[in-house]
A protein has these predicted regions:
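C-terminal alpha-helix
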Residues: 269-280
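A catalytic-pocket lid/entrance helix-loop region that shapes and gates access to the active site
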Residues: 1-92
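Short, solvent-exposed loop/turn segments at secondary-structure junctions
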Residues: 9-10, 219-221, 253-255
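Active-site-adjacent alpha-helix of alpha/beta-hydrolase-fold enzymes
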Residues: 26-29, 221-244
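Alpha/beta-hydrolase fold catalytic core
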Residues: 69-222
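A short acidic (Asp/Glu
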Residues: 14-16, 223-227, 258-260
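Short glycine-rich catalytic loops that host catalytic nucleophiles or stabilize transition states
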Residues: 4, 247-253
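Catalytic histidine-centered segment of alpha/beta-hydrolase-like enzymes
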Residues: 251-263
Length: 283
């Protein structure tokens, strides 16, 4: 089987661009989760659980927002007003801000705007984190506060482990993220978005016993959970193969294992996935 943690397979689902509205729809439930966490939703929504809240976001994204974006410039004034009110109530953003952005609020704009009145920003890897920018008037955050908080201790811990515990030394630069890691990647795509769901579908068809486990954080804005759900639902799998896919969700971000409760849940979920896969294989 395969375990996918905080995954993106189809990069069209997360690349904000002038000619690509899909990420706007697929990240909306994550906006809802983030607004709920920071207590920016109406009282009726704040009283719901995180699972209930994101389900409201899913329904709006699929049944109202996505159809509206197909004809956004031809909506009547009344339709635009209704859409703006619903969008605002599910994201914590003002109706005026949503309308001024023509309903296209990308991640940077959301991270800057949600807590602007508090002169704070929200994180990309984990939207529970708050950041402080040089000024509160920009269009996007200066940096990712969750990355700023997570990266230094992980770097220090790994350096201590490799040099201290293992006694390994090298003058070769070690990349924590990006740089020398991502630059040479070959996605085997030309003039198209990278999409690994296609080879995954082929692999599942060739091996119908293969199981897939997807672990997604509600507050992960880098690889939103609804984008992963959409990708899986669009793989055009045979019905007999769909039952081989398991989703589990965590009240954390991209690196859900930094949260103690989510780490324990991830271990339980992964253990159950492996045990279930082995049990089926032995039948």
């Amino acid at each position: 089987g395969i375990a996918l943690v905080s995954t993106v397979m189809n990069f069209q689902t997360i690349r904000f661009a002038d000619n690509n509205d899909l990420p706007l729809v697929l990240i909306l439930p994550s906006y809802t989760a983030t607004a709920w966490y920071h207590k920016k939703l109406p009282p009726a929504m704040q009283s719901k659980s995180i699972a209930q809240v994101v389900d409201e976001g899913r329904k709006f994204a699929a049944n109202e927002y996505a159809p509206a974006m197909l004809r956004i410039d031809s909506l009547s004034p009344a339709e635009r007003n209704t859409l703006a009110e619903r969008y605002s109530s599910l994201t914590g953003l003002s109706k005026d801000f949503v309308e001024r952005n023509n309903f296209r609020v990308d991640l940077g704009e959301f991270n800057k705007e949600l807590l602007r009145s508090e002169r704070r920003t929200t994180g990309r890897l984990d939207s529970r984190f708050k950041g402080i920018d040089r000024d509160a008037a920009g269009d996007g955050p200066d940096s990712d506060p969750s990355m700023n908080a997570i990266r230094p201790p992980y770097t220090a811990a790994f350096n201590s482990y490799v040099r201290g515990d293992l006694g390994f030394k090298s003058d070769v630069e070690y990349y924590i993220l990006g740089g020398g890691i991502t630059t040479p990647w070959n996605w085997n795509t030309n003039n198209a978005y990278a999409d690994t769901s296609i080879p995954l579908k082929d692999a599942m068809a060739k091996n119908p016993y293969m199981k897939i486990f997807l672990a997604q954080g509600y507050y992960d804005m880098a690889t939103p959970f609804y984008a992963a759900e959409y990708t899986v639902s669009a793989m055009n799998l045979d019905p007999s193969l769909r039952r081989n896919i398991t989703f589990d969700y965590y009240e954390a971000g991209h690196m859900m294992y930094i949260d103690t409760k989510s780490l324990a849940k991830l271990k339980r979920d992964a253990t159950a996935f492996i045990q279930n896969a082995v049990a089926r294989a032995e039948r």
